[in-house]
Amino acid sequence: MNIKRAKEEIEHTVKAYLAKDALGEYAIPAIRQRPILLMGPPGIGKTQVMEQVARECGVALVAYTITHHTRQSAVGLPFIRQRNYGGRDVSVTEYTMSEIIASIYAKMEATDLKEGILFIDEINCVSETLAPTMLQFLQCKTFGNQAVPAGWVIVAAGNPPEYNKSVRDFDIVTLDRVRRMDIEPDLPVWKDYARAAHIHSAILSYLELHPQNFYQINADVDGTQFVTARGWEDLSNLLDTYETLGLQADEDLIREYIQHPKIAEDFSAYLDLYYKYRDDYGVEEILAGQAKPAVFARLLQAPFDERLSLVSLILSGLSTRFTASHQADAVADSCYAFLRETKKALATVPEDIPDGSAEMFHQQIADYDAETQQKREAGLLSKDALTTRLQVLAVLRGWEGELRRANAAGTQDAFDLLRGQFRSLADARETAQQAASAALEAAFDFMEQAFAESQEMVVFVTELTVNPVSHAFLTENGCERYFQYNKDLLLDHRKAALQQELAAEQRRHGGV
């Protein structure tokens, strides 16, 4: 199965294992809660999936790479205890609590989340001394003499033997006690994730043209050459930062992430062209509605991969504006909700307390900050959600400064000042939305003039549809031409599907 399907199965499993009956007991007893065993090549996204599932299910996550541990840290350290058995004093060996079990309790204490996921990675690559402990863990859900706490779902991951020389096969007794999921790389599924994760547009465009280079692991006389989904994502983060800093990524740098020489060389050449197209075609000018006439003449002679790269660059520019609009909208909505609570709280502040409104507002901000840090520690905030909260905190602290400088005479004056500050924020949101809409209209103007209803327009409209950022913007703000092209595209797909059905029907009847 692909990683998206695996994520859905894990999410459903967590919900099922943590479901309770009318008496408050777990509907599926712990003994029947089979651990999940994910088997797949390295760098496919198994660890990230666990973070997403924990966040979406609202539970804690404790993750360990078991190859980093010894038997002592997994089982605990031995110590001597005096016991009396049958009237005879004896010395017996007992063990301290496993570091892994202790970390679960520490996580529960730090996050106040009593249920969660224990994720053990590379479980089939452990040393010979630790292998029996891992079998006991999967079969009995214990480390040494300590059981995994109730309400914690066990998920383990490993690599097939063709990817790791240290792999140990599980026996049938162990496999009969787990739920095994075999995961394979899937570019279309990864691209869905990549769009939401804002993977660099050059990488998405390159993989659109060269899908065979998405994931490869090849062994030859020179060693193992590989490229993984993790490598592409990590490279994307670096490219974004390099662009911000005005630095250039060369082939040597790319080889550090894409450890497949031919693919690294190919992508490096493509990246150079990608930046060249951005400058030569003037993408920012296109999105400002000021495309140069020479651009259209050049496109008439350009090969398909160059035209597709330009479409990707235009989509990237739009995505940046859609993201800014979405972020401004999210910050404004959060601040509005915060002010509603502020209005209620101000009603309880006595008018005769000096600076009472500002102190109350300060305490509200402190509570919001503490809540943010608690959610962050628990892993319950996505990257976008955390960014929104941090921006909201920055806005609120600015408002607090204005409130203190104004030295408002009463609670009503204080709220009027805050309401005025919010109007400025709402204006900024409107400006971001208008800028994104104007760029979208300019993009359609260019696409119609340059490509009309060709394959490039199909790619453009399709990407606007499947990208979650652009889809959300279009749903909220609309665009007449997008809806028209999307409608025509759907009609074309339905017509093609109908023609295929008719052709298949004719073949079944011998062409009669």
Descriptions of predicted regions:
Residues 35-37, 57-68, 80, 89-116, ...:
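Conformational switch/transducer regions in large eukaryotic molecular machines and scaffolds
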Residues 2, 184-186, 243, 303-304, ...:
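Alpha-helix capping and helix-coil boundary motifs
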